[in-house]
Amino acid sequence: MIIFREQLIALLPIIVIGITIVGIMLSIIYSRNQFKHAVLTIIGMIIASVSSLLHMMWSMNKSGQNFFQLICIDNFSVLYVILIMFVGIASSILGYVWLVYYPVYRSDEFYLLLLIASIGGILLVITNHLIVLFLGIELISISICGLISYPVFSKKSIELSIKYIILSGVSSSFLLFGIVFIYCKTGSLSFIDIKEILSTYNNVNHMLSQPSMTLIVIGLSMMMIGMGFKLSCVPFHLWISDIYQGTPTAVSMYLATGSKIAVTAVLMRFLLILPDQYNELLHIFLSVSACCSMLFGSLMAIPQISIKRMLAYSSITNAGYLLIALIALRMNNCAIIQESISVYLVSYLFANVGVWGIVNIVSTAYIQKEKNDADTIYLYHGLFWREPMLSVIFVIAILSLAGIPMTFGFIGKFYLLFIGISNQLWFLTVMMIISSIISMFYYLKIITNLFNSNFVNNTNINYDILKKWMIKPEGFMVIIVAIIILFFGVYPQFIVNLIQQFVI
């Protein structure tokens, strides 16, 4: 097949990130300069985002570019490529500041792993083939394994890396076995071919009446298990709290946002190829997981004193919310549902960048004495009375994560409630409301600690370093994020209109 100019433009994000990886590798040979490589990483991701928009403008009113039935680059994929690049930029900024204060040897390779994970995320959002899907997930998983173990002086990090490798390997095995079972019956790994073959069967009962067709059900079930691990929904969540707590903040943020966005995007594509006769099967599986994720995540976060563990369980809860939207998407594939999922993911992304950014800022003032992040909630006692602006930004990000009105997070959660009610998912919608109410307990616990006047001077925090947060790149980033959260919380129509241009 000849690759034409339009297709070359469509592939530019991957090409740009690939060139950036090669450039940094060659640069490391001659000299190690963390600042230079961090800047190169950010520039590469910005160019990749711009190139995605160029493709969208070039192929206006077109369905997208297909390559050998392997990938499909359309407006939908452009949005999620931009989101993944934004996560990568934010992680690069947080990672740079963290590496400045942590004595980690060979810090330049941190950005290589981050870029490789970003390529994996891009492959997931543009995939139109099960092999590309598996390749994208593995690129993310392998890169994350390296990023988790980056603090090589910490035995805990090495232990967590081994745990993640084992559990990730198990989930990938389930995913690969599911792909094999589907291929055994359909004879194809292309989404388009699989959709056509599965559509030839009238219903699931007819399918199950043929012994060989049970391979499809087994394959789909195993693939959902593999995806469930990557999405960190119950009961595939056991790894998440330890990993979030023990890894660098930049890596935890990438896990909470980048990988979740990429997996959600590929699930949207994959679920849309399955015929309607699979609705009942998928509805049961996703509903049970959604209910358990929402309740378990909210309840388990309440007794935690570790902010990172709270955010881990919050991530589980939000995975449950996303499953409700995916169920609605299966029941009624329309633009408003895809728009709702996208709005929620964007609001979730900004809230997480704000929260994790503040944790990273405080950690740089804490790890001067202790080689750990500022994870314990008591380290934030009375922070408002020393750094009021930093605390206000922290409160804005947390309130957005909780879905409080006048924040962008409320708009995202409102969209999910709307599609839940519109598709008559009454029980799941009620569970979502209950879970949101429960989650307020641990979100408010963080906020009240900030305003506790009994602990104004925390001896574990170097306030001379902390007061310089505004002149750091991560300080500028969280200020911008807080402004965006408030602006889109008051005037969401701008971002909603923008996202409408990207729906499938």
UniProtKB/Swiss-Prot annotation:
Per UniProt, subcellular location reads as: Cell inner membrane
Q: Give the GO biological process terms.
A: ATP synthesis coupled electron transport
Q: How does it sit in the membrane?
A: Multi-pass membrane protein
Per the record, its GO cellular-component terms are:
plasma membrane
| Enzyme superclass (EC) | translocase
Q: Where are the transmembrane segments?
A: 9-29, 38-58, 78-98, 114-134, 135-155, 164-184, 216-236, 254-274, 282-302, 309-329, 341-361, 392-412, 425-447, 476-496
Do you know which InterPro entries this protein is assigned to?
NADH-Q_OxRdtase_suN/2, ND/Mrp_TM
Q: Which reaction equations make up its catalytic activity?
A: a quinone + NADH + 5 H(+)(in) = a quinol + NAD(+) + 4 H(+)(out)
Task: Indicate the family of this protein.
Answer: Belongs to the complex I subunit 2 family.
UniProt subunit comment: NDH-1 is composed of 13 different subunits. Subunits NuoA, H, J, K, L, M, N constitute the membrane sector of the complex.
What protein is this chain from? NADH-quinone oxidoreductase subunit N
